[in-house]
Amino acid sequence: MVSRRAFLAGSAGLAALPTLATLAACGESGTTFERMRASGVARIGIAGERPYGYLNGDGAVTGEAPTVARAVLADLGVGGIEAVQVPFARLLTGLLDGQYDLVAAGTTITPSRCARVAFSRPDFLAPLAFLVPEGNPQGLRTLGGASRSRTRLGVLEGSAEQDYALAAGVSPTAITTYDGQSTLYRAVANGEVPAAVLTRLSLLDEQSRNPGSRLQVTPGFAPSTTPTGEPVYPVGAFAFRPADTDLVVAFDTALTDLQTSGRWLETVRPFGFDDENLPPAGLTTAQLCTS
């Protein structure tokens, strides 16, 4: 996540990085990157969360993160991807257990996750929002407000939103966890919980597929890490095993090229992203892992 001050400050530009050709030639024998380049296929972990990473009606993997990953990996000489879908809460565990080579699911960078895995450079910014009944009867605008009103909230199990809610003072007993985006949506629709919190992009995508639900998505907001703290912007990225340093460096270089060339926006627009979701050029993963 990134503070509002850091977000507005941005940066003068991206640091110089090695060329893709140089990086591709440096893979050590036996590394994940070497195996991917030899086979031409990367295995990616997804959680079925729209619009980040999911399977379409034909069973093909799609979403913002797999599509960006496909473009980045193609620039690295890896032309194919195979998806493994697991529950959201098991994404990082599956990565560390070797089920796939990287996570392409719009995973939010947080210090606790940085202690387990290596993240790519920031891929996108994603403000949060509430899913509430029409008219927003609780008047929810922020997680601090939800805490003060003692509103019960639905969240995805193991999500950054769960951590944000707890940090904002929401009682653990007021939080109900769900294992999937659609299940979370139905919980509000069925009155199991009066509200849910998730990225606004996810909620708008779910809302578009549930016309007539009599629910609404609130305006986006930046959560705080404490009840009175400075707002922070959730930032999504790709996750890797810590030992796969050559893959992370190569992936970052290609992702940087994709973002600075304008191809990133062309790639993500079909999934509801726009230039407001593009991270500031100078925002680094190191900053996010310590904030």
Positions of predicted regions on the chain:
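N-terminal secretory signal peptides and thylakoid transit peptides that target proteins
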Residues: M1-P18
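Extended ligand-binding regions for polar small-molecule ligands
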Residues: G27, G63-D75, N136, G144, ...
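Extracytoplasmic small-molecule ligand-binding "clamshell" domains
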Residues: T32-G106, A115
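Flexible hinge/capping segments at coil-to-helix
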Residues: F33-R35, R121, P133-R152
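Short loop->beta-strand "edge-of-pocket" segments that line small-molecule binding or catalytic clefts
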Residues: V41-G48, Y52, L143-E161
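Short helix-initiation/N-cap motifs at beta->coil->alpha
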Residues: A83-T93, T176-R186, N190
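A ligand-binding cleft/hinge motif common to bilobed small-molecule-binding domains
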Residues: G106-A115, L166-A167, P194-V232
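Periplasmic-binding protein-like
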Residues: L125-L131, P211-D252, D275-S291
